């Protein structure tokens, strides 16, 4: 596959719910961009995820009018050569050095790009949200992550491997807590809560225990518990004390991660950018946002807290341009061109 406008960077942001992919020229010009289903190796498997990346890369070129016809799913012969000089792949689940090496080797075998750069999706969010490339990012989508980068380049990141690494949060954590509270309220082990009806209703069921049995029996994917995150916040806003407790716990966990990371970077007195990225931060629950910001400010008074205002794939593209030594003007142009509106839904 070739494109007349030379693609310097293939930028990829892979989450557990979606994949954003963009082809970018060396001067920051956007060649094409698409949004498709998740290509996460954790969600769909490594080979299927790579097949999706090939399909999406082909579509990104086709969006610009320069690419070939879309290949059949899994058609690995559709790529006679690299589509870009460098590929910046920012992937959910690229959490350990071993993950990064394994993913880089697998991506390299597909021949999508001449040079492969693999990072975690938190790296993309931080690079997109912090213009100078340093600060802290809290990622709270289906899962949870925290990354901090010092102005000198030193990085601190949480393991982000769930309860086995001391982490709690994300949509899945909220959903699991909501289900547990609904079950305990129903059987008398805990206080009554409006979620006793709302939790099963989300999945077309009637009782909380039906949700448990559906997950246990393989009829309902456990990852779908993340769908309960908006339900938790909605019930919390209605005055349900149990739901409010879960939302407060999430705010405290997120703030604690940010403050601890900033302390480890020895930046407590600095005006540290703290970027909030991920679907959970789109909640309209004001108490959650107030509590989160207050907890961070209590530990880092000069922290500059802001929600990420651009797609994280912008950060992946910037990391690729950084690797190429592109001038700042290229990044400025990219930020203007690579917007949510330019991410064409994959067909």
What feature does the model see in each segment?
Residues 46, 87-92, 99-100:
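N-terminal functional module of multi-domain proteins
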Residues 94-197, 343-346:
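Phosphate-binding/catalytic loop of phosphoryl-transfer enzymes
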Residues 1-68, 75-84, 108-109, 128-134, ...:
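ATP-binding/phosphotransfer module of carbohydrate and carboxylate kinases, centering on a glycine-rich
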Residues 37, 90, 147, 159, ...:
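Residues in well-ordered beta-strands of folded domains
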Residues 90, 119, 273-277:
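Solvent-exposed beta-strand sheet faces enriched in polar/charged residues
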